[in-house]
A protein has these predicted regions:
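Beta-strand-enriched, solvent-exposed domains that form extended recognition/catalytic surfaces
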Residues: 1-132
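Low-complexity, Pro/Ser/Thr- and charge-rich linker/hinge segments at domain boundaries
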Residues: 119-155
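A sequence-composition feature that detects small, non-aromatic residues
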Residues: 8, 68, 75, 114, ...
Length: 184
C-alpha cells in the first residue's frame, strides 16, 4: 500500500490510518511471537503493528452521572515491530490485533513492489479471523467468520474501506449481512 501521510500532504487532505493489512491474529501482553518473513524487496520495510484501544474519557456529556462508563475506541496506531527476512522473535509490549505494515514511500506503488510472504505459525497468537470482501465475497461467509471470532474487535475489509468494530456490537447490529454496508 502507499504511504497515506505522503498522499495526505500531496493533496492537502486529512491523514487517515494506514491500517490496511489485518492478520486476523491477536496477541496478549508479553506474549512471544514468531514471525517468518520471505524476501523483502530492496529498499522496502515491513513491520507488524499491534492495535488495541485509546481514550478512556467518560461518556457523561452533562457531567451529572458519577457512574458514567469510560469510553474507549480502537486506536489508529500502536506498537510497531520491524521485520527482517527469516525468523523474527518478538515480545509483545501490549495486547491487540496484528496488522502487517508494508507501505511504500512516495509514488513507489508505480514500481509495483513484489508482495512479501509472512507466516505466523500456529500456537503463536490467537486466530480471530477477519472478513475480506475480495476473498470471502458473501454475507454467509461474513456471518460464519463473525460467529467464530473470539476477540473484542472484528475487522471487515472492503474494496475501499475497512471497518474495525466491537465484535459484540456487530453481532447485535449486523450478525448476518455486511455487503450492503461495504458498498455504501
Amino acid at each position: 500500500y502507499s504511504d497515506n501521510n505522503y498522499w495526505a500532504t500531496q493533496i492537502q487532505t486529512k491523514k487517515y490510518s494506514d491500517l490496511d493489512n489485518p492478520t486476523g491474529i491477536y496477541v496478549k501482553k508479553d506474549e512471544e511471537l514468531m514471525v517468518l518473513v520471505g524476501k523483502i524487496p530492496d529498499g522496502q520495510q515491513v513491520s507488524l503493528q499491534c492495535i488495541w484501544e485509546e481514550g478512556g474519557t467518560k461518556q457523561d456529556f452533562d457531567h451529572q452521572d458519577p457512574n458514567a462508563q469510560n469510553y474507549v475506541q480502537t486506536a489508529t496506531s500502536g506498537d510497531k515491530y520491524s521485520l527482517v527476512e527469516g525468523v523474527n522473535m518478538l515480545k509483545m509490549k501490549g495486547q491487540g490485533q496484528l496488522f502487517v505494515m508494508y507501505n511504500v514511500k512516495g509514488e513507489g506503488l508505480k514500481q509495483n513492489p513484489a508482495p512479501v510472504k509472512i507466516h505466523i505459525p500456529l500456537g503463536r497468537g490467537i486466530v480471530n479471523g477477519f472478513f475480506d470482501l475480495k476473498e470471502h465475497k458473501t454475507d454467509a461467509k461474513y456471518a460464519e467468520l463473525l460467529s467464530k471470532a473470539t476477540h473484542k474487535y472484528f475487522c471487515v475489509r472492503g474494496e475501499r474501506m475497512m471497518f474495525y468494530f466491537h465484535r459484540l456490537k456487530m453481532l447485535d447490529a449486523a450478525p448476518t449481512e455486511i455487503l450492503s454496508a461495504i458498498h455504501l
